[in-house]
Amino acid sequence: MSQSTSVLRRNGFTFKQFFVAHDRCAMKVGTDGILLGAWAPVAGVKRCLDIGAGSGLLALMLAQRTDDSVMIDAVELESEAATQAQENINQSPWAERINIYPADIQQWITQQTARFDLIISNPPYYQQGVECATPQREQARYTTTLDHQSLLTCAAECITEEGFFCVVLPEQIGNGFTELALRMGWHLRLRTDVAENETRQPHRVLLAFSPQAGECYSDRLVIRGPDQSYSEAYTALTQAFYLFM
């Protein structure tokens, strides 16, 4: 199922097959989310969970990448963001496959019996500090409402034995997140360090954990080449989504 989007619209981000309005969401569509949605392993998955859905970007990207039989649940605590995510999904080709739940993930998870093959999250990572302009943005940026240990616990409670839990984080915070996950019994299976160009140190890291032990595959992704155009690797990863790639 596909739908080509060719007209640019305001107050959001136009992709090849869908549009994400984000003017009522604290955190906008950005490179982090696009990287995670394009990178997360989807082979063989039957059921996906997006924790902290925001505008619905990750749920929509997973829907585009997976078979029509794959169901996606997306949980978002902030009511305005959840409403906008639902509107974005309703206007997409995959409305029947994505369920948006305006809920606290820690409460929502206690009511679920289903297990997920893939859990994905672009989580908050700032410690409490300078106040944000709105409570919604503070909630999206800081770990006060869902710290990393709680996030890992929630994922552990509803993942299949061979499933993957995928996140994107700043490099140093990702290293701390990995140490915490390993202490909690997770196994790191995939790691991609992301740098802006060949001369820069990685500034983001994509991580995939599993309850099941196995070999860990690591690599490095450079976003831009020497001429500042997108690299071949980044283009190959994201060209199914970016409108002008």
UniProtKB/Swiss-Prot annotation:
Keywords: Cytoplasm, Methyltransferase, S-adenosyl-L-methionine, Transferase, tRNA processing. Transmembrane segments: none annotated. Pfam families: MTS (PF05175). It is found in: Cytoplasm. One of its GO terms (molecular function) is tRNA (adenine-N6)-methyltransferase activity. PROSITE patterns: N6_MTASE (PS00092). It catalyses: adenosine(37) in tRNA1(Val) + S-adenosyl-L-methionine = N(6)-methyladenosine(37) in tRNA1(Val) + S-adenosyl-L-homocysteine + H(+). Gene3D superfamilies: Vaccinia Virus protein VP39 (3.40.50.150). CDD domains: AdoMet_MTases. It is an enzyme of class 2 (transferase). One of its GO terms (cellular component) is cytoplasm. Coiled coil: none annotated. Belongs to the methyltransferase superfamily. tRNA (adenine-N(6)-)-methyltransferase family. PANTHER family: TRNA1(VAL) (ADENINE(37)-N6)-METHYLTRANSFERASE. Specifically methylates the adenine in position 37 of tRNA(1)(Val) (anticodon cmo5UAC). This is tRNA1(Val) (adenine(37)-N6)-methyltransferase. The lineage of its organism: Bacteria, Pseudomonadati, Pseudomonadota, Gammaproteobacteria, Enterobacterales. The gene is yfiC.
